[in-house]
C-alpha cells in the first residue's frame, strides 16, 4: 500500500477534528512552543501557518500574541479549513487581525510577500522524503526571519513506522539552503518525571534566517 499525501489528507481531513484527542503531550507541545516564542527577541506581526488543520495552533498564537496583525492559515483539506474558520471566528481575539484561510498544498502555494514567522506543527513529518528538500526551500522563500516546525524526531526510525510518517534530517536540510550565518536549532520536547525526563520524540526546529546574499 502506497501513501499519496493529497488523497490521504483530503480523506482524513473529513474526520480529523472529530477523532482528535487533546492529551498531555499536545498540552506539553503547546507549553514548549509558547515558552520558546516568548524567548525570541522582538515581535512578529505577520504569520504564515502551513497545515493549520482545524486551527489548534492558529488559536493558540492569536490568543497569546496581540502583536500579530496578519495571519494566513493554509491547509490541504477543505474540511479542515472550514473547521479552522469556525473555531477562530468563535474565539475572542485580543486585537484586530487581518485573517485569511486558504486551501492549498505547500507545493502549489504561491505568495507575493514574506512573513515574519512561518510555522508548521506536525506537518513536515508527513512529507515524502523525495519532496522534503523542495518543501523546505519553499519555506525559506516564504519567511522574512523565522521558521518553526514542530515534528516527530528520533535518531533512528522505529521498525513499525506508519506509512504516512517520516523522519527527516531537518537541521541538515535547512543548512543546505541557507547562509552559514543562519541559526538552526532543535529543542527536544521532554516531559518532567520524578527521577528525570521523558522524551516525547517531538522537537521544535527553529530557523532564524539570514537572507543576505550567499558568497
Predicted regions located by residue number:
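A conserved beta-strand element that flanks and buttresses the S-adenosyl-L-methionine
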Residues: 119
Amino acid at each position: 500500500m502506497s501513501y499519496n499525501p493529497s488523497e490521504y489528507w483530503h480523506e482524513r481531513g473529513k474526520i480529523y477534528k472529530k477523532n482528535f484527542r487533546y492529551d498531555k503531550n499536545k498540552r506539553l507541545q503547546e507549553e514548549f512552543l509558547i515558552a520558546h516564542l516568548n524567548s525570541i527577541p522582538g515581535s512578529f506581526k505577520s504569520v504564515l501557518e502551513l497545515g493549520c488543520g482545524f486551527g489548534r495552533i492558529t488559536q493558540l498564537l492569536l490568543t497569546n500574541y496581540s502583536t500579530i496583525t496578519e495571519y494566513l492559515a493554509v491547509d490541504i483539506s477543505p474540511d479542515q479549513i472550514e473547521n479552522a474558520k469556525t473555531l477562530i471566528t468563535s474565539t475572542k481575539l485580543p486585537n484586530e487581525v487581518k485573517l485569511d484561510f486558504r486551501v492549498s498544498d505547500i507545493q502549489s502555494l504561491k505568495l507575493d510577500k514574506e512573513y515574519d514567522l512561518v510555522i508548521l506543527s506536525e506537518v513536515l513529518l508527513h512529507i515524502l522524503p523525495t519532496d522534503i528538500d523542495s518543501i523546505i526551500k519553499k519555506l525559506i522563500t516564504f519567511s522574512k526571519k523565522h521558521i518553526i516546525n514542530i515534528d516527530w524526531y528520533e535518531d533512528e526510525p522505529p521498525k513499525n513506522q506508519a506509512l504516512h510518517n517520516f523522519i527527516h534530517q531537518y537541521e541538515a536540510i535547512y543548512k543546505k539552503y541557507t547562509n552559514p550565518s543562519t541559526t538552526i536549532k532543535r529543542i527536544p520536547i521532554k516531559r518532567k518525571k520524578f527521577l528525570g525526563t521523558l522524551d516525547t520524540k517531538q522537537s521544535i526546529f527553529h530557523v532564524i534566517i539570514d537572507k543576505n546574499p550567499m558568497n
